[in-house]
């Protein structure tokens, strides 16, 4: 495994660990999810260029589009939760609460 692949795998693993550890605040969870998506984007682009699979060259762009949509929905949810509750705790996302 080359050092670039190892660094990207470590970055993805650290972002995943951040999602699992810092899941009390929505903003920190969203930042860790963005780190995961960016490391996946770079890994996918490098693998496509390394193996010369140019028929799948649009896959990283599609992943980036879905990542931007996820960020937009997450920030809209963050604004709505902070307007309603005054904080960004993930426990406020429970829809079964009255």
Curated annotation (Swiss-Prot):
PANTHER family: NADH-UBIQUINONE OXIDOREDUCTASE CHAIN 4L (PTHR11434:SF0), NADH-UBIQUINONE OXIDOREDUCTASE SUBUNIT ND4L (PTHR11434). Its main location: mitochondrion. One of its GO terms (molecular function) is NADH dehydrogenase (ubiquinone) activity. Its EC number is 7.1.1.2. It is found in: Mitochondrion membrane. The keyword Translocase applies. One of its GO terms (cellular component) is mitochondrial membrane. GO terms for biological process: ATP synthesis coupled electron transport. Belongs to the complex I subunit 4L family. The chain crosses the membrane at residues 1-21, 28-48, 59-79. Keywords: Electron transport, Membrane, Mitochondrion, NAD, Respiratory chain, Translocase, Transmembrane, Transmembrane helix, Transport, Ubiquinone. It catalyses: a ubiquinone + NADH + 5 H(+)(in) = a ubiquinol + NAD(+) + 4 H(+)(out). It is a multi-pass membrane protein. Pfam families: Oxidored_q2. It comes from Phalanger vestitus (Stein's cuscus). This is NADH-ubiquinone oxidoreductase chain 4L. The gene is MT-ND4L.
């Amino acid at each position: 495994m080359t050092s670039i692949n190892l660094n990207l795998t470590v970055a993805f693993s650290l972002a995943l660990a951040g999602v699992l550890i810092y899941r009390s605040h929505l903003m920190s969870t969203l930042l860790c999810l963005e780190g995961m998506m960016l490391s996946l984007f770079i890994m996918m682009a490098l693998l496509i260029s390394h193996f010369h699979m140019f028929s799948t060259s649009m896959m990283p762009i599609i992943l980036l589009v879905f990542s931007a949509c996820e960020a937009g929905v997450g920030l809209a949810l963050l604004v709505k939760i902070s307007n309603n509750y005054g904080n960004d705790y993930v426990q406020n996302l429970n829809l079964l609460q009255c």
